[in-house]
UniProtKB/Swiss-Prot annotation:
Species this chain originates from: Aspergillus oryzae (strain ATCC 42149 / RIB 40)
Stated family: Belongs to the major facilitator superfamily. TCR/Tet family.
Listed PROSITE patterns: MFS
Membrane-spanning intervals of the chain: 69-89, 106-126, 143-163, 197-217, 225-245, 266-286, 297-317, 339-359, 375-395, 396-416, 461-481, 537-557
Gene: astH
Name of protein: MFS-type transporter astH
């Protein structure tokens, strides 16, 4: 079969709606082609149905040697470490940055600029990875991230820092999903769960140690090193990939410039990018900077809704040339994995941000100590990401881990929501471990699922859809958690400690709470703070539970080539 738009020869099952298990036994595909007369076809309604065709692409694929794969994994680990570090390293540096630039009003934009561009551009990188060389698109994304980091480190003012964060976020949009695609091009399917588990575990570690490293740089060197650290690590990543990763040839090598622009779905991007920016700004400003009924918040949500409908219409119209082809969204493995990623990461991000806050405010520890006390959850996530990845490779099936992960995580999250001022060490350590086991078992399985059920030509788009949902889930529920916490804290202080200045408590933050409130009012203020944080934990419990439906719709496809 020939792709008319590019003139590139495609094998059966590649780009024709067939869902492909990249490491199935020879010549075996799962037929998920759309059938207009029976919508259930294309969803692989019978998980035992198999169709034999002549396709041995996986068996003829040449993967890098073991030592080359090791070098590639080192480079990807460094890139993912930098990426995760950049999301949290500023937490302890912001006070000194605000003091140096006299920019307290800009503090919110230091995180938002990075988050907005990352979320808005993630899907666009899916098209780039689909039609151009994965290696060179990835290196360009890495270059953008490095340029943004350099600007942040060298900037003389607050505006430069915001611009640098936006540029770095643009690059980060393609790094994590690109790392997963490089793994897919570098190892057979049965080895990918372990490798993606390593990357996912490292991401969790870097997210939590970020504030610790940021504090060390800020106190002993300069806050600028929070960004300069990315430069040598990124350089090593780029060098290793150039030397050891061959990459894939661009599928547009025979296409004209006009055809390439058509494939990039510029109209869809023009609808989607501002839509994401609108909803994230509305969630960040709503209930904090402006009340929810403010005209600006209502306008942002309205524009988001209109643009989202327009984007959906463009995707339906463009079909295979769309950023998100409807054929893939109709595939239950894709939308199930996307829903699972959205919900589980939404739950995880709330605990990543608010559990250290509980330690700092209720237990009265420093930011560094809170990071250490958060290690039980982090280590559990890392260890069980790797263990579950290894077990998937050995047993063949990822679906059982996707089913048990939200159940364990929901139990752990529920127990964490019971934390009180007098909770002992055994409680908060044990609850964290249980929750971390659940998250670790499930966090990377959606990537394995889409890579095990889609044709090679669909891997970039499928992977990026899942990564986008994971990113946007964290972005949205970071704001949701903040709103729940702040609104509940204001109500609690009004009823339990009415003489405490609530606005001053919010501005002081968790570490300064005990210095802001007088000793006679401190117990009541701490009770109000504890209740507000655990209210945010309830949101995390709900999202962990909501991840389960995404797991239940997944096919039982084996990465070892068997299907139940």
């Amino acid at each position: 079969m020939t792709d008319i738009s590019t003139g590139v020869q495609l094998k059966p099952g590649i780009g024709d709606g067939t869902v492909y298990n990249g490491n199935m036994s020879k010549d075996t595909l799962v037929n998920c082609s759309p059938d207009p007369e029976n919508p259930e076809k294309g969803q692989a309604s019978s998980p035992r149905t198999q169709i034999s065709v002549d396709d041995n692409e996986e068996s003829t694929t040449e993967y890098p040697s073991s030592w080359k794969l090791a070098m590639i994994m080192i480079s990807l680990c460094l890139a993912v470490f930098c990426l995760a570090l950049d999301t949290t390293i500023m937490a302890t540096a912001i006070p000194k940055i605000a003091d140096q630039f006299n920019s307290l009003n800009d503090v919110g934009w230091y995180g938002s600029a990075y988050l907005l561009t990352t979320s808005a551009l993630t899907l666009s990188f899916g098209k780039l990875y689909s039609f151009y060389s994965i290696k060179w698109v990835y290196l360009q994304a890495l270059g953008m991230f490095e340029i943004g980091s350099l600007i942040c480190g060298a900037t003389p003012n607050s505006l430069g820092l915001i611009i640098g964060r936006a540029i770095a976020g643009s690059g980060s949009a393609g790094i994590y999903s690109g790392s997963m695609l490089i793994v897919a091009r570098s190892a057979p399917l049965e080895r990918r769960p372990l490798l993606t588990g390593i990357l996912g575990g490292l991401f969790g570690v870097a997210s939590v140690v970020g504030p610790l490293i940021g504090g060390a740089f800020t106190d002993n060197l300069s806050w600028r090193w929070c960004f300069y650290i990315n430069l040598p690590l990124g350089a090593v990543t780029g060098l290793f990939l150039i030397l050891f990763f061959d990459g894939a040839k661009a599928t547009t090598q025979r296409a004209t410039i006009r055809d390439q622009l058509s494939q990039l779905d510029l109209l869809g991007s023009l609808c989607f990018l501002p839509a994401i920016i609108c909803v994230l700004l509305a969630l960040q400003w709503g209930g904090t900077t402006y009340p929810w009924h403010d005209g600006r918040i209502i306008a942002l949500f309205t524009v988001f809704g209109v643009l989202l409908l327009a984007f959906a219409g463009v995707q339906w119209w463009r079909q295979e040339k769309a950023t998100v082809p409807p054929r893939l969204i109709a595939n239950r493995n894709v939308w199930g994995a996307a829903l699972f990623s959205f919900c589980l990461n939404a739950s995880f991000i709330i605990f990543t941000y608010y559990l250290p806050m509980w330690f700092q405010s209720i237990k009265g520890v420093t930011a560094t100590q809170s990071g250490i006390m958060n290690l039980p959850m982090v280590l559990a996530v890392v260890i069980f990401s790797i263990i579950s990845g290894g077990l998937v490779g050995a047993l063949g099936y990822y679906t059982p881990f996707m089913v048990i992960a939200p159940l364990i995580a929901a139990i752990g999250a529920g127990l964490l929501s019971t934390l009180r001022m007098d909770s002992n060490n055994a409680s908060w350590i044990g609850y964290q471990i249980l929750y971390g086991v659940g998250v670790g078992c499930g966090l990377q399985q959606p990537i394995v699922a889409v890579q095990g059920s889609l044709a090679p030509a669909d891997l970039p788009t499928g992977t990026v859809i899942v990564m986008f949902m994971q990113t946007i889930g964290g972005a949205i529920f970071m704001s949701v958690g903040q709103n729940v916490f702040q609104n509940q804290l204001m109500r609690n202080l009004a009823t339990q400690a009415p003489s405490v200045d609530a606005a001053r408590v919010l501005q002081a933050g968790a570490t300064m709470l005990r210095k802001t409130v007088s000793s006679d009012l401190l117990p009541a203020a701490l009770r109000a703070y504890n209740s507000a944080i655990t209210e945010a934990f309830y949101v995390a419990v709900a999202m962990a539970v909501l991840a389960l439906p995404g797991a239940l719709v997944m096919q039982w496809i084996s990465v070892k080539g068997r299907q139940l």
